Amino acid sequence: MSIQKLNDTTNSGYVSSEETDSLLVSSSNPSKGGGRTALLRQVKSNSTNGPTTGASTSSSGSVSGGGGGSGSGGGSASGSAAGASKPTLMRQDRTSTYLTSPQQSQHARMGSEESMRGGASGAAGHDEDVEQGLVRSSIVPDIEVHEEDQEQHSQQLNATTMATMTNNQQQQQPTISIMNLSLKPGDSHSHSSSPGSHPNLGTSSYQNLASSIPPSVPSRCRACRNCSRRASTTPTTLIDRSASRDSVKSAFQQGNLSGSMAICISNSALPQQQQLQQQYHLQQQQQQHYQLQQHHLHQQQLQQSQQQVPPVLITSSPTNGSRIIRQSSQPESSSTAICCGPHSACVGHAHSHSHTVPNVSLKQLRESSGDGIAGIAADSLRINGGMRPFKQLRKPASTLSIPGSMKTPSIANREQISSGCNEEAAEALVGIHSDYPRYEMYMEERALTGGNTSRKPSTNSAKHKPNVGYRLGKRKALFEKRKRISDYALVMGMFGIIVMVIENELSSAGVYTKASFYSTALKTLISVSTVILLGLIVAYHALEVQLFMIDNCADDWRIAMTWQRISQIGLELFICAIHPIPGEYYFQWTTKLANKNKTIGTEMVPYDVALSLPMFLRLYLICRVMLLHSKLFTDASSRSIGALNRINFNTRFVLKTLMTICPGTVLLVFMVSLWIIASWTLRQCERFHDEEHANLLNSMWLTAITFLCVGYGDIVPNTYCGRGITLTCGMVGAGCTALLVAVVSRKLELTRAEKHVHNFMMDTQLTKRLKNAAANVLRETWLIYKHTRLVKRVNPGRVRTHQRKFLLAIYALRKVKMDQRKLMDNANTITDMAKTQNTVYEIISDMSSRQDAIEERLTNLEDKMQSIQEHMESLPDLLSRCLTQHQERIEQRRNFLHPDTAAVAPIQAPTPQSMFNAAPMLFPHSS
């Protein structure tokens, strides 16, 4: 094994300049192998997202060909024998090189099976052109690394040229061979003699690629030959870093060459300018050969249908062995070679592979969205898997609600998943209602880079998106619809009750019988209204379920069907379904008459009585309508405030607010309605057995007496139906009486303003009484003193009278003081607490302002202390300079006065420490 550095021009589109410095090449001993090359290594490993392969093997790969041209022919034969092999890419010391397939056992000096396929197996159906096999699942075009001398290479080129010209109409799989030629002395110019010595370089395949492609040679896309896309082997050494994509593209279009031409340049000491001139002549010859064979290649492209698997890239390091680098960010899928532009060369692809889905990553590659240097860097990152981590930046915030089949799509369901959509990342676990469109979900990236997320609408998508604004609008529309349906239900319920009352009153008055047409017509009308009412109730609860689904992001209406909701719906339907049916039906009703000496009475009673009374239960719809029409329920601001305070807006809350706002009106309406309904129902139950109850006024008297909890007992119910109604009236009446007392007491209570006025007036009166009582005490004291001390004759009766008044004045004074204390205690209301709070706030504000002033003074003091400290720190230096100057002046004066001491060494400047620690200095005086 020998390691040689290739030229700078060997840089491919996917290999950096650092990687080309350590390409491993293998050169066999000329004495043993006759200058034949040996493959370094044949590695067969698993791709990170492709099928597994066998273990890695290595073989010499050299076959004696018999002469200069037989070697090339032998290579072709051995290459065709392993047409189904899976070549891999080996990476040594950060160097990406393509090696031959691990299943090949013998190779010619020019290396790969596809390079010689035209000479040995051109008619085989397993071969495919590069346009159809570029992006397959697991096979990659080969790159062989060789090192040979110039004589053997010239023989091989001649043999290869003959094989290529003979089979130029057959399809050839692209193969790139990178070789480092060792020239002998004197043969340095043998490789650049004339363009005619390399007739095979103008073919349309990638065969016989020797050495590296210089930067001046434009290379085309391997998928289609007529576009200006850079192939993976396009050199980038001489491209200026500031060059744009258009400039690079125009430079590539000048040669109009295919991406499969090979140029052999000797590794000699030729100047670079001469090499470039030789390459230009070779390009002209290659262009002519390419134009002759292009027509035949297009015909062959239409006949090829075999598909291959995408290439596998394997890198290895000389220290830690081989490791797998992911080339693509998706599972394997059947895809076609992507054409870089819409031209005639790509007709075969669109015709033969119309059923496949183009690769999204290659679509990105042909989008003109960057310059040449950026495209080269992106290609390198894609091949080496460096773009894989950036895929996470385009994923949703959460994938908990995304099904597993959508997270990791397989080959079978990839197209179905690409046409559908995943769940929203922020979506609730219960999903979104099916009536509303789901968001256009992020698709799984299918490109080498992770791809751009393609958005496609769902099959169940509507014309609106279920965002927050749409949901709020839909919720508001459902609220309005629910309110209208509730109003209609109340109207139909009240209509049925009114018709029922009319029918019973007409039949009880003897206007018609139950068997008459009028009775049947009215009952039929009641039945029709009942059916409509049941439908409205079902529609109301359907809207309730839809609102629940919108509020909770539910996807299935059965989620909202709890046992409580089902029971409520069933109970409402049962209550509203009860009504008198058309026809004449009677039953025998036997009861004990309490008003007639407890005799037993039996009467034939129609079923309409038992079916009519429960119809009054439909009045519960009034509470629902009150709730839906309440300003507290319909106003958005009140609902927002209630939601912030965790208040549930239901019928109970609305009734409480009504009792707070207008308690007297609500209580009066309720009591009067209950009184009328109870009186009519009691009359219907009792009129068949007792004539007294046939009169509505008697029933109203009994109901009122029972309602007020008086109970005279002059009229009593006989049937159990009447007794039950009376019992209900008594219980409800007790509650209404308590409510009436509460309402009256609240009405009689003083308001806060009235309380303040009353307290002020009472305080004024008590103050006056206190002054009067004090004055009376003083007056009686003076009178007692007067009648006992200032008179000549003391009158005991008058003295006792004034003493009695004196004590009464003292008692009055004490009582006034006690009343003042009670008034002060009662005056401690919320307003007084507010005053106290204001006082405390003022005190705290004053303390806060003082504290701020103290902090400001402390800050100023700290600044001053810091400045003093800085001056103190600079003081030693200043003293040192002053003392030094003073010492110098003293020395000068001493030298001037005493010249004999001038020979003494100059004194160094004292340090601050030495100055403070030194002994006192004695200065001489001049005499």
Curated annotation (Swiss-Prot):
The chain crosses the membrane at residues 489-509, 530-550, 569-589, 609-629, 658-678, 724-744. InterPro entries: CaM-bd_dom (IPR004178), CaM-bd_dom_sf (IPR036122), K_chnl_Ca-activ_SK (IPR015449), K_chnl_dom (IPR013099). Residues 45-62, 219-232, 296-308 have a biased composition (Low complexity). Changing Y785C: In RNA edited version. Residues 1-131, 181-251, 296-336 are annotated as: Disordered. Residues 696-716 dip into the membrane without crossing it. Residues 1-31, 95-107, 200-214, 314-336 have a biased composition (Polar residues). GO terms for biological process: potassium ion transmembrane transport; potassium ion transport; regulation of membrane potential in photoreceptor cell. One of its GO terms (cellular component) is membrane. Belongs to the potassium channel KCNN family. SK subfamily. This is Small conductance calcium-activated potassium channel protein. It comes from Drosophila melanogaster (Fruit fly). The gene is SK.
